[in-house]
Amino acid sequence: MKKTLKILGLTLAVLLGLLIAAAIILPLVFDPNQYKGEIIRLVKEQTGRDLKIEKKIGWSFFPRLGVEAGGLELSNAPGFGKEPFASIDAAGVHVEFLPLLSGKITVDTVYLHGLNLNLAKNAAGKNNWEDIAAKEAGATKPEPEKKEAGKPSLEGLSVGRLDIRRANINWRDASAGSTLAVRNLELSTGKFVSGEPLDLRLGFELARDKAAPIKAALQSRLTASPDALKLAKLDLKVDDSRLTGSMEIRNFASPAVRFDLALDRIDVDRYLTAEKTTGKPAAGGAKSAPAAVAGQPVELPLSTLRSLDVNGKFRIQEMKALGLRSQDARIQLNAKNGLIAFGPNQAKLYGGGYRGETVLDVRGKTPQ
């Protein structure tokens, strides 16, 4: 036992010594600020924009080894004024120390604090990011470099948690005369591993034109892979409403959707009133589809309906919509192979009740 403790203590002492040595040697032999000019030149070359780095790029050594920068600012596209396209108060990447000894890069934390992103479309319909997108699309992909022996490989790269604080995203559409802003966005996640669950926390305030802002907060256990997405222990709060439950999407090419959700209360009229106040549709200026002419049959999107694969339950404890109030609404949806069953559904309405089921069969040529 004493021998084991001695070995453990010696190992910790060696690791601590290596960390202290790195903290002393790295700033002496490598100053990232020497590359400020090169970074600014590359950004100008690749994007056509001017990058400012007002604060020094520095090292961090505790509790993780990392590099940090602050006072970042990227200029706007020509014709969109002096307001910066993006600015960041502080940003950094921290890596785990031990994996570096075996040539692996394990990112512990990526953080972004005080992001301000200004997206805009002018009266002519041109936006302020398409010039960057055009340059990226026209760039030729370099030949893959051959891996050198003993050189750390990005193949072992692992990304840890993401930490975004005090972010603001502003959208201004001069062609439609509308504005949209996501304010005080806070996002934190667990470690990113494809197919493995991670904790997700998201909060923000949404403001559109002159309408009252909407506050939202989300907590969930997220599992994502290239072909599936699952939200477990979902807890979403929007103003005075709270949605809980779970949902899952499998096979993005031909989605299979499963959900089990419960909403405590919602006042739909509150949001409809806000839409009337702004005089604009909730989608941010999109034109609504023309209404069907009375007496004429509505053409159903049969191919889309036949491909539906949905199974889920949705419960609403209290709801107000179009001046009507309902309680304990239970809604079920089951769609598979062209047979769509909406129900059995039920709800309490003004001392009475509703119970019913609707089935749509689109397996044949004529819907039934």
Functional labels for PLM-detected ranges:
Residues 114, 206-208, 238, 251, ...:
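Transmembrane beta-strands of outer-membrane beta-barrel pores
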Residues 1-48:
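N-terminal type II signal-anchor transmembrane helix
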